[in-house]
Amino acid sequence: MINQLRIYTIPPDNKDHFLDRFRDHAARIMARYDFRILSMWTDERNSQVKFVYLLAWDDAADMDAGWSKFMADTEWSDIKKRTSEEQGDFVLGIEDLILTPCAFSSALGGDQ
């Protein structure tokens, strides 16, 4: 299993619209392609708004296949286009990290 950490920098004025779109549309469509979202957070320090979420994947091939299907989804493309036209920019930047646990780290949930 691998974990993927996604960090989106979002315009402060669009925070609520972004979160609504993610909750109502992105997460639902991601579930269609077997995305396992473990948790989601926001960080609003330093005059920036960041949306952070952690995913679990079986392996890199599973992750790549899931993202390819999600990005090719016509419903998601239509939603992104429509909401961006109505509300403006939703994402200013994306940081994508693939996390490998250290040998001395406990697994998520505290299991060894």
Q: Which residues are covered by each model-predicted region?
A:
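An amphipathic, aromatic/His-enriched active-site/gating alpha helix that lines ligand/cofactor pockets
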Residues: 17-38, 58-97
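Accessory recognition modules or surfaces
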Residues: 3-9, 19, 42, 47-64
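Hydrophobic alpha-helical segments
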Residues: 23-25, 48, 53, 72-73, ...
